[in-house]
């Protein structure tokens, strides 16, 4: 939705007594919870959780290792099946009775294994768009990565590896038209430029740790040469010793002063 249309619609709703004053003034809040997990609060107060690896994540603030402390979750998004993105998602889905939106083949496996019922594991895929809440749209886009589901079979107590589908990133469009591109885990690919040209994200959540994803230099190239988005928050670094990339290295490679890097520590919030 165009931001001006959103403001006009909110003004009418307020004049009719349908929305409180704070709904118009509220900003987009983006809180980093470590790795690729974020708590995003939309302009009307809807809570979006992405890639929730919280309980075992060494970077997650202690309060959020208790899933109930996330509050009411309205939208739950998972980019792929690796445990550092998926681990706590089923529990959050059940706790809030909220669907877990994830790649279609991944959720087919989730249902087949009995991890979640079909109602909490809807299927969609790259280029597909869903509307999990009124005024909020989520589109799945390409990510250059892999995806499997590691699952402990309750009958045998053996660890098993199952199909995780194609990994994705998400374009999250909020009620006021603000667009967030959560890249998921990804390496460089040329269609990042297409994603930027077509969807025009206002904020990119970008992996920088390397080894499993882009490292600092590749991420800086993606930000400055392909995406050219006005705002970037770095993610997917610091939690795994194999992902050695640092925020300082990423900042050092960034050469475009028009792109603002928001240097969040786990638990900190950026407002837009």
Residue locations for each model-derived region?
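Bacterial N-terminal signal peptides
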Residues: 9-20
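Active-site neighborhood of phospho(di)ester-bond hydrolases with catalytic His/Asp-centered motifs
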Residues: 49-51, 73-81, 101-104, 180-184, ...
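Active-site-proximal loop/helix segments of hydrolase catalytic cores
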Residues: 157-225
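Active-site environment of divalent metal-dependent phosphoester hydrolases
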Residues: 56-57, 83-87, 107-110, 128-130, ...
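Binuclear metal-ion centers of metallo-dependent hydrolases, dominated by the metallo-beta-lactamase
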Residues: 100, 114-132, 220-272
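Pre-active-site segment of Zn-dependent metallo-hydrolases
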Residues: 43-83, 87-94, 117, 147-162, ...
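Bacterial N-terminal signal peptides that target proteins for export
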Residues: 1-10
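Boundary of Sec targeting at the N-terminus
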Residues: 24-26
């Amino acid at each position: 939705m165009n931001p001006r249309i959103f403001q006009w619609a909110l003004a009418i709703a307020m004049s009719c007594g349908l929305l409180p004053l704070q709904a118009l003034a509220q900003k987009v809040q983006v809180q980093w919870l470590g790795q690729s997990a974020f708590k995003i609060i939309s302009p009307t107060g809807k809570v979006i959780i992405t890639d929730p690896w919280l309980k075992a994540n060494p970077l997650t603030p202690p309060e959020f290792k208790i899933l109930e402390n996330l509050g009411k979750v309205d939208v739950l998004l998972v980019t792929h099946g690796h445990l550092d993105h998926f681990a706590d998602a089923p529990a959050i889905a059940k706790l809030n009775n909220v669907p877990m939106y994830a790649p279609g083949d991944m959720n087919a496996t989730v249902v087949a294994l009995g991890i979640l019922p079909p109602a909490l594991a809807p299927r969609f895929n790259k280029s597909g768009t869903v509307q999990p809440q009124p005024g909020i749209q989520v589109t799945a886009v390409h990510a250059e990565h892999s995806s499997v589901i590691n699952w402990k079979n309750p009958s045998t107590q053996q660890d098993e590896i199952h199909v995780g589908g194609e990994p994705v990133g998400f374009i999250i469009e909020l009620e006021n038209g603000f667009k967030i591109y959560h890249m998921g885990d990804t390496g460089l690919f040329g269609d990042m430029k297409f994603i930027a040209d077509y969807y025009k994200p206002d904020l990119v959540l970008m992996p920088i740790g390397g080894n499993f994803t882009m490292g600092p230099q590749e991420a800086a190239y993606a930000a400055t040469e392909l995406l050219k988005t006005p705002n970037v928050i770095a993610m997917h670094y610091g939690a795994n010793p194999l992902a050695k990339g640092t925020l300082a290295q990423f900042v050092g490679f960034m050469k475009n002063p028009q792109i603002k890097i928001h240097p969040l520590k786990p638990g900190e919030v950026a407002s837009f």
